[in-house]
Structures are given as C-alpha cells and as structure tokens.
Amino acid sequence: MTDPLIPLAPGSLSGKTALVTGSSRGIGADTARYFAQAGANVVINYRNKAPRAEKLAAQLRESGVEVLVVGADLTDAESVQAMFSEVEQAFGSLDILVLNASGGMESGMGEEYALRLNRDAQLQVLDAALPLLSDGSRVVFVTSHQAHFIRTTPTMPEYVPVALSKRAGEDALRERIPELEARGIGFVVVSGDMIEGTITATLLERANPGAIASRRESAGKLYNVGEFAAEVAHAAVDPIPPANTRLVGDTTSFEGE
C-alpha cells in the first residue's frame, strides 16, 4: 500500500527538476515536499515570506536533493524572467512546472489583481518557462471546482472574482495545449473542492460561518492540504487524463463545465 505521506515512489524523480509557484506554504509546499521525497531537485517560489521558504528548503534538502529558493512577484514580468534565469543557471532545464500560486481575496490589492494573478501571470510564467521545458516535461495548473465549474454552478459571492479569474486562466492555458503537445509537453488541470486548512477556506468560512461544514456534508469528504497536494504531485507524473482534467473528490454538486 502506498504511504499517503509519500505519494510518489522514492527515487522516481531522480535527476528531474520541479518548480512549484507559491510553494512556501500550504498545497504548494506539500507538493514540493513530495517531489523532493521522490528525488527531484526543487525550486521553491514565494512572494514575500523568505524565512518560511528557506525553512522549507532546509527540510527538503534533508532528502538529499538540491533546492533553489526564489522570491518573485508573478504579476511582474521582469521578476518572472529573473526567476527562470536563476533556475536555468542552477539546473539548466525544468521537467515539472506546477502553476499553484493564486489569489484575489487579499485586501488592498485592487480590483484587477485577481485577473492579473490568476490569468495573466499564469501565462507569463508558462512563457518564461517554455525555453527550459523539453519533450516529456509536464505543466500542471491547480484550480478549484468552484472555479472550474463557475459557468454552470454558482459559488459564494466572496469567491466569484477569484473563480471567474481562475477559470479565465484555465481557459487561456488550455488554448496553449496544441502548442505544448507539439513540443512534447503534457498539460493537466487539477481541480479540487474546498480544501480544509487552506487560507482560502479560512477566509470563506469567516465570511460564511458554517460553509465548510455544509460543503463537507454535501461532498461526503473534503480533502486536506496534504491529501490534495498528493493529487497534484501525481498529476505531474501520471498519464494525461481525459480532457487534460484531473477532478479530485466529489463533483456531483457541480453541473457541466
């Protein structure tokens, strides 16, 4: 039986390099941890919490892998280019790119921030990564059911701007699939329900007391951070699923796509 805390076989990613955006905490951090446990060299990306990122890096290095920590504002083109220049200098190439970072519920970031981060920045990161990605590499985009199904299934008002912008990002990335396939690069969308223990779930619960319990009752189970991160890690190595989409957990409450 597979250890749920070690979802990928030790050594299965030896010699590979993986970059996870927004990986100093939460789903991104656990995804990076699983890659390191499997032997991959890892790039930890963070926006403004360097000590937290460095602490994680020290933990991952105990697996015997190389870890690069790079701070970058993904909405800033120069910052993104600088990040990939560091990656190229350190590792030469990239085998796995996980587009995990997202946002839009933060206060004081402006009305367009959600779209800038969840759509525009995702494309910006992909474009900057392409010269380092080669035949056999994989790009994974992390989203939520509330965003993936936003066109057909309403969500909480507080989450609508995030959901719409993440769906816009997903659509924009899907338009790149033919180009990626021509280069031999796989693309997978991983969509999950509300994830217990995430900042987003906490903020939604604060705005809608009882929201998590209600959703858990409807779904039967809500994944926690580590469990969902394991699905993201598997999406980076498993065969490409139908429609390039890995749906995690219950989707019976959602209609269409």
Predicted regions and their residues:
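Catalytic loop of short-chain dehydrogenase/reductase
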Residues: 102-108, 138-182, 194-198
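Conserved glycine-rich cofactor-binding loop
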Residues: 17, 24-26
